[in-house]
Amino acid sequence: MSNLTLSQFLQQEKGNLTPELAQVIDTIAATCKTIDQALQKGALAGILGSAGNENVQGETQKKLDVISNDYLIDALKVHPHVGGLASEELDDFTPAQENGEYLVLFDPLDGSSNIDINMCVGTIFSILPAKNAVTQAQDFMQAGTQQVAAGYVLYGPSTMMALTVGNGVAFFTLDPETQTFLLTTENVQVSADTQEFAINASNQRHWEQPVKQYIEELLAGKTSVREKDFNMRWVACMVGDVHRILCRGGIFLYPYDLKDPKKAGRLRLMYEANPMSMLIEQAGGASTTGRVRILEIEPTELHQRVPVIIGSKNEVERVTSYH
């Protein structure tokens, strides 16, 4: 069986997918191949470890955070159909081309704390329509429902892309010989029920009561009202956890906690929560803060953080009902 290339797949898609949008997605995919090659060199190229500074989030940047960010900025800021860029790693947005039809937001290397131990990392991206001929910061303040495409590239045992353009979710696998993304799964679906959950349990003492109650029920398994056992998984890379959910169901929680009351959550709305929520919802799952649907949040700042509860629909709805 011959697999469609990513470019061929994009040519066949309908709906929101214009030829211009297809070109932007192709450029993101090509840049992620370059990131993949840098990751594979690792210690051989002297690019592991800290870059010696912090990003706007107050997180210590890894060398590959900076390298991946630079690759994406350099490739997209000259793209004729990109009006502006926003990165988790940079304080402000980056202007691109006048009259560019799209805005691209990204987390260049999600889970970068995994780099030095050779575990999975990924690139997350979100594409919004541009609002003006010359992009302004306010143009990025669009709810997730306005996304025209979203996806991620997972750098794991094989390199894979998950993509939605508003018409379901598809998986592509990078052929290492031809360096081509090939379609390997169409119409990805998240099961409504699950017996797997992902959460950083070390924060339990900081959680709100609804989340504590929910997790206590899961841990009690058959002896609780749930009457079945659950397994816990935690990759420390949202791309890895969401990919597992898209493949076999599950629920991922990074809930609101009281560790730092100034932060409503830990994950970034524009670079992580929105694109992952679009993917999960397009695959039949659900996504919420525990109180509101993530895709309906009207952002007020570029680096806004939100709680995230995402995955199999029946479990997400159960957590929401506890709030």
From Swiss-Prot:
SUPFAM superfamilies: Carbohydrate phosphatase
Bound cofactor: record note: Binds 2 magnesium ions per subunit.
Coiled coil feature spans: none
Catalysis performed (reactions): beta-D-fructose 1,6-bisphosphate + H2O = beta-D-fructose 6-phosphate + phosphate
Pfam family, one: FBPase_C
Annotated residues for binding of Mg(2+) 1: 88, 107, 109
Origin: domain of life: Bacteria
Pathway(s) served: Carbohydrate biosynthesis; gluconeogenesis
Gene Ontology terms: cellular component: cytosol
GO biological process, one term: sucrose biosynthetic process
Residues engaged in binding Mg(2+) 2: 107, 110, 272
A GO MF term: fructose 1,6-bisphosphate 1-phosphatase activity
Similarity comment text for this entry: Belongs to the FBPase class 1 family.
Summary of subunit composition and partner proteins: Homotetramer.
Protein's UniProt name: Fructose-1,6-bisphosphatase class 1
Species, as recorded: Acinetobacter baumannii (strain SDF)
